[in-house]
């Protein structure tokens, strides 16, 4: 086995001391003169129609400068390279717990948080689909009945199947025949993100 200089070796993290002592500066630590603080109201329903959003009490709170919802800007979707299926803020429906519904800009963080608590949302629950294997079986409701109209929809799979990636390389059957050991298993891993928090 090759003697690697980096892989498999312990390393001293140059930013470790700043992070463990709390001296590292993150974006949330930065305050500029006159800056407003923003807080989001997010959905506590996994799938529901939005019957109404009442922001009047939040807008009347002293120190609140602006309250916006998904209806306050042009309808635009974003998402992965494969499919643009998300909105900046929910309109008409919410599709997951934590989906943004409204944003409050206020003079300070406490006022913004108080304003978010004053926003009233009326929901109508819709059956939610949380098991990916059931979702692609065709035995559950379509999460997005209008999926084929979404930008980035490149494969006409229909239902809850938006795209498929085939990663076979070479002669798979021959690879199995030539293998001393074949392991077939289903693995469950935690969500990961390649966008790590970095000190400024």
Predicted features along the sequence, with ranges:
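Structural alpha/beta core scaffold segments of enzyme domains
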Residues: 1-200
């Amino acid at each position: 086995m090759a003697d690697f200089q980096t892989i498999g070796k312990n390393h001293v993290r140059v930013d470790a001391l700043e992070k463990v002592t709390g001296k590292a500066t993150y974006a949330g630590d930065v305050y500029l003169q006159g800056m407003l603080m923003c807080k989001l109201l997010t959905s506590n329903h996994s799938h529901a129609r939005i019957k109404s959003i009442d922001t009047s009490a939040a807008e009347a709170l002293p120190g609140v400068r602006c309250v916006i919802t998904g209806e306050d800007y042009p309808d635009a979707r974003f998402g992965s390279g494969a499919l643009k299926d998300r909105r900046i803020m929910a309109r008409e429906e919410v599709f997951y717990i934590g989906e943004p519904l409204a944003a409050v800009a206020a003079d300070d963080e406490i006022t913004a948080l108080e304003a978010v608590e004053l926003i009233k949302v009326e929901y109508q629950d819709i059956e939610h689909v949380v098991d990916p294997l059931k979702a692609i079986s065709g035995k559950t409701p379509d999460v997005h009945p209008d999926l084929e109209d979404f930008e980035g929809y490149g494969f006409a799979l229909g239902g809850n199947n938006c795209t498929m990636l085939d990663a076979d390389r070479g002669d798979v059957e021959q690879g199995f025949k030539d293998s001393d050991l074949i392991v077939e298993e289903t693995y469950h891993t935690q969500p990961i993100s390649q966008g790590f928090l970095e000190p400024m």
